[in-house]
Amino acid sequence: MPKQKTHRGLAKRVKRTGGGGLKRGRAFTSHRFHGKTKKQRRQLRKASMVAKGDYKRIRQQLARMK
């Protein structure tokens, strides 16, 4: 059986945290900021954690990621 490979596109978009979670960037941050409030823009600057349901789904894709 072939080796499980890390999904490289996903590996470039997330970082594993010390506690084993996955940190990701946020969507809606590339353009069209005039339609967003100052509060939204400020909150979009922060990184976010991958949700529990998504983590279960993508765990296989990151099998060999450190």
UniProtKB/Swiss-Prot annotation:
Pfam families: Ribosomal_L35p. GO terms for biological process: translation. Coiled coil: none annotated. Keywords: Ribonucleoprotein, Ribosomal protein. Residues 1-16, 23-45 have a biased composition (Basic residues). The keyword Ribosomal protein applies. SUPFAM superfamilies: L35p-like. One of its GO terms (molecular function) is structural constituent of ribosome. Residues 1-53 are annotated as: Disordered. It comes from the Bacteria. One of its GO terms (cellular component) is cytosolic large ribosomal subunit. NCBIfam families: rpmI_bact (TIGR00001). Belongs to the bacterial ribosomal protein bL35 family. HAMAP family: Ribosomal_bL35. This is Large ribosomal subunit protein bL35. The lineage of its organism: Bacteria, Bacillati, Bacillota, Bacilli, Lactobacillales.
